[in-house]
C-alpha cells in the first residue's frame, strides 16, 4: 500500500493508487514507458501482456463481454459452460496478469495491498461460479487504472513540458570571431552566444550587445515581454522577440534556472504533503481492516443467521472490490502535483507539498525592504539648486563629478540628470564623504552632509531641507564650492510599482504585513508608509530579524518571511514559510527559502496563499468523495443487493472523479504562454 518514494532529485515524485510512479521527468527522459504498462497493475513498470496497454485492455473487454453473453444466451450445458469459463479466464489473463503478480508479491511480503484485494475478489468470484462477472470486473478495473494513469500524466506533462522548451543548439562565437552552431550542452560558461529574433535562449546568460523584448513566461510566469539590454540577465528557454542579442553564458546545460526549477519541483514532489502522509497511514490500516470485515461477512452470517454460504461469500467478495482505496490513495498526490505545477507555471517555485498546504495557515508576513518592497537600487528622485545658484550649471557640474565616481549614489545622480559632460581636473575621491575636482576651472565638491558640515557650509535652512528629505527615506548629496552650497540631490530606493497592491492583497487575505530592514528607522517608516505597511522595524541585524520573526509567530501565529539577501537567510529558514525573491536573490536566500518567486513579484505571495487554500479545499473534497462513495456501497454490499458490477463502477467512478477534481488546480492559475 505504501507508494514508492523516488530517490534523489531525478526520480518519480508520487504514486498512483496501485503504487505506479507518476514520473515528472520530461518525456525524453522518462523512467517508465506508460504505453507498455498494464493498466491493471503492472506496478513494477514492466508489461505483463502480449500487447501494449490499450489494445490489450480493449481485447480483454471484448472477451469479457463474450463470456457474459455466453452465460446469458447460450444453453446451460457443460460444453458451453466450459467455453464461457475459458473466455472469462482469457479476459482475466489479458487484463489482470500484472495485478495477480503484484498481489502475490504483496501477500508474500505480508501486505494487503489493492492488488491483493482485487486478486482475491476476482479469484473467489470465479470459483463460486460468477466467472462472467469476475472477467468483467477485472477488465473494467484495468480500464479504470489505465484512464487514471493517463489523467494523472497531465500533471506530469505540464511541468515536464517546460524542459522541452530549451533548444538543443546554440549559435556560439568562435575564437576567430565567426558564428558556429553547436550543441547547447557543449557551450562552456563564458562563451558568447547569439540569439536571433524568434529564437529561444539556449542557456542562462548576461546580454553583452543588442536590445530586445524577451518572453520569459516559461520561467517567471510574466505574461508581458520584458525589455532586455546590455547587462541584463536572460534565462534559458525564454524567447527573443524583437532584436538580435549577444550574451555571455553564465550557466551550462543542466545548471540553468529552468533546470533548477524542474529539479526542485521533482525533489519537492518526492516528499509527502501532510494530508498525503495521513492518507497513506490511514490506507495502511484501512485495507487489512476491510479484509478482516469481508472475511467476517463470508463466515459469520452463515454460522449465526443461516445465510447460504455462496451468498455470504459473494457479498464478501463484492465488499473487497468496493474496499479498494484507489480513489482515496490517488486523491492526494494528483492534487498536490497539480497545485505545485500550477504554481511553477506562474513562476512560483514551491519546494514541496508540505509548504503548499501550510501556506494557507499564514497569519503574518515579514518583508525585507531592499529588493523586496523596493527596487533595490538608488534612483535620483528630487534635486534643487540652492542659494540662488544657476540650475543648468549646477546640474551639469554635479553630473560631471558623479560620472567619475563608482559609488552607487553617484551613479544614480549621473543616471538621473540630463547632462553635457564637462571635463574634470584634479578629480579625487574623499573616502566616506564624497568626491572633489575642478569643473571649468572651479573647485567643487559633491558629498554628504558630513563633508558640508566639516567645511562649515551648513545653515538652519539647509538643515531643515535635509531633515525633510531624510524623513522621506532619502539620501541627500550636496554640491558645493569653497563658499556655499550650490545644489541638493536626493536619492532613494524607490518602492516597486506593485508593492502597495501586493500588501493590500495580503491584508485582504487576513495576513498582517510587517517590514524588517537594516536601514535606519526613519527610512523604514517612509518606505512602509508608501507600501501601506503599518508596522515597520529598522536598524535590524540578521539576528534581530530572526528574533522579530519568532516574536511575530508568538503574536500572530504562522508567519512567513520574504527576502532576497544573505542577511535574510536565517529568518527565511526560521519562518513557517520562507519566500525568496528569485530573480534578484542570492543563492543562499533561495536555498534557505521554502518558496522562490522567480520574477520578484510580491503579489505572488498572495497567489501562493490562495492556491494553498484552494488545494486544501480540493484535497478534502476528494477525500470526502472517496470515503462517502465507499460508505454508501459498503451499506449496499452488506445489507442490500450490490453486485460486483456496481462495486467496480463505484471504485472506477470515484477514482476518475478525484483525479478530474485534482487536475482542476492546473486551471487555478492561467497557464503560461508557450511559444510555438
What feature does the model see in each segment?
Residues 24-29, 64-68, 88-173, 179, ...:
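Actuator/coupling domain of P-type ATPases
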Residues 59-62, 277-306, 318-325, 332-333, ...:
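Bilayer-spanning, highly hydrophobic alpha-helical transmembrane segments
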Residues 380-511, 521, 530-549:
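P-type ATPase nucleotide-binding
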Residues 89-92, 142, 285-286, 313-331, ...:
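Small-residue-enriched core segments of transmembrane alpha-helices in multipass membrane transport
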Amino acid at each position: 500500500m505504501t507508494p514508492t518514494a523516488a530517490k534523489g532529485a531525478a526520480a518519480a515524485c508520487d504514486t498512483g493508487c496501485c503504487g505506479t510512479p507518476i514520473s515528472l521527468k520530461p518525456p525524453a527522459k522518462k523512467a517508465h514507458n506508460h504505453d507498455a504498462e498494464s493498466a491493471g497493475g503492472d506496478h513494477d513498470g514492466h508489461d505483463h501482456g502480449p500487447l501494449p496497454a490499450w489494445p490489450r485492455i480493449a481485447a480483454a473487454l471484448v472477451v469479457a463481454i463474450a463470456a457474459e453473453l455466453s452465460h446469458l444466451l447460450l444453453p446451460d450445458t457443460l460444453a458451453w459452460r466450459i467455453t464461457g469459463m475459458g473466455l472469462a479466464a482469457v479476459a482475466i489473463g489479458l487484463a489482470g496478469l500484472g495485478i495477480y503478480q503484484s498481489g502475490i508479491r504483496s501477500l508474500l511480503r505480508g501486505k494487503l495491498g489493492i492488488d491483493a484485494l482485487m486478486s482475491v475478489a476476482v479469484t473467489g468470484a470465479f470459483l463460486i461460479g460468477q466467472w462472467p462477472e469476475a472477467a468483467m470486473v477485472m477488465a473494467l478495473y484495468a480500464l479504470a487504472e489505465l484512464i487514471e494513469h493517463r489523467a494523472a500524466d497531465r500533471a506530469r506533462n505540464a511541468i515536464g513540458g517546460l524542459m522541452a522548451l530549451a533548444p538543443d543548439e546554440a549559435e556560439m562565437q568562435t575564437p576567430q570571431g565567426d558564428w558556429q552552431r553547436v550543441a547547447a550542452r557543449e557551450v562552456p560558461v563564458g562563451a558568447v552566444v547569439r540569439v536571433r529574433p524568434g529564437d529561444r535562449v539556449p542557456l542562462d546568460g548576461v546580454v553583452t550587445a543588442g536590445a530586445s523584448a524577451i518572453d520569459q513566461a516559461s520561467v517567471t510566469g510574466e505574461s508581458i515581454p520584458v525589455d532586455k539590454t546590455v547587462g541584463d540577465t536572460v534565462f534559458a528557454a525564454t524567447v527573443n522577440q524583437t532584436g538580435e542579442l549577444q550574451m555571455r553564458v553564465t550557466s551550462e546545460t543542466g545548471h540553468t534556472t529552468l533546470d533548477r526549477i524542474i529539479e526542485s519541483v521533482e525533489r519537492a514532489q518526492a516528499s509527502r504533503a501532510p494530508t498525503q502522509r495521513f492518507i497513506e497511514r490511514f490506507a495502511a490500516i484501512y485495507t487489512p481492516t476491510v479484509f478482516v470485515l469481508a472475511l467476517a461477512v463470508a463466515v459469520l452470517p452463515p454460522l449465526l443467521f443461516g445465510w447460504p454460504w455462496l451468498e455470504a461469500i459473494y457479498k464478501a467478495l463484492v465488499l473487497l472490490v468496493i474496499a479498494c482505496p484507489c480513489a482515496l490513495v490517488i486523491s492526494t498526490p494528483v492534487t498536490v502535483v497539480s497545485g505545485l505545477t500550477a504554481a511553477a507555471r506562474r513562476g512560483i517555485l514551491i519546494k514541496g507539498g508540505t509548504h503548499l498546504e501550510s501556506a494557507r495557515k499564514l497569519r503574518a508576513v515579514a518583508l525585507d525592504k531592499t529588493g523586496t518592497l523596493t527596487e533595490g537600487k538608488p534612483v535620483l528622485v528630487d534635486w534643487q539648486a540652492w542659494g540662488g545658484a544657476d540650475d543648468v550649471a549646477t546640474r551639469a557640474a554635479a553630473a560631471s563629478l558623479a560620472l567619475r565616481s563608482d559609488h552607487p549614489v553617484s551613479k544614480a545622480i549621473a543616471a538621473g540628470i540630463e547632462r553635457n559632460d564637462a571635463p574634470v581636473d584634479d578629480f579625487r575621491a574623499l573616502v566616506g564623504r564624497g568626491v572633489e575636482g575642478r569643473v571649468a576651472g572651479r573647485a567643487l565638491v559633491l558629498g554628504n552632509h558630513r563633508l558640508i558640515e566639516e567645511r562649515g557650509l551648513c545653515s538652519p535652512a539647509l538643515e531643515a531641507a535635509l531633515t525633510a528629505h531624510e524623513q522621506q527615506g532619502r539620501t541627500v548629496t550636496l554640491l558645493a564650492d569653497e563658499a556655499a552650497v550650490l545644489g541638493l540631490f536626493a536619492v532613494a530606493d524607490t518602492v516597486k510599482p506593485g508593492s502597495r497592491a501586493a500588501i493590500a492583497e495580503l491584508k485582504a487575505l487576513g495576513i498582517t504585513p510587517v517590514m524588517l530592514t537594516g536601514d535606519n528607522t526613519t527610512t523604514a517608516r517612509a518606505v512602509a508608509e508608501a507600501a501601506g505597511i503599518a508596522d515597520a522595524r529598522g536598524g535590524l541585524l540578521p539576528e534581530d530579524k530572526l528574533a522579530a520573526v519568532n516574536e511575530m509567530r508568538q503574536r500572530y501565529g504562522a508567519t512567513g518571511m520574504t527576502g532576497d539577501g544573505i542577511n535574510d537567510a536565517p529568518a527565511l529558514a526560521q519562518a513557517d514559510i520562507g519566500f525568496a525573491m528569485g530573480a534578484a536573490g542570492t543563492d543562499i536566500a533561495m536555498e534557505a527559502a521554502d518558496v522562490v518567486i522567480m520574477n520578484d513579484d510580491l503579489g505572488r505571495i498572495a497567489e501562493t496563499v490562495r492556491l494553498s487554500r484552494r488545494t486544501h479545499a480540493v484535497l478534502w473534497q476528494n477525500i470526502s468523495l472517496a470515503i462517502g462513495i465507499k460508505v454508501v456501497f459498503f451499506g449496499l454490499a452488506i445489507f442490500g443487493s450490490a453486485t460486483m458490477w456496481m462495486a467496480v463502477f463505484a471504485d472506477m467512478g470515484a477514482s476518475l472523479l478525484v483525479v478530474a477534481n485534482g487536475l482542476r488546480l492546473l486551471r487555478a492559475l492561467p497557464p503560461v504562454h508557450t511559444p510555438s
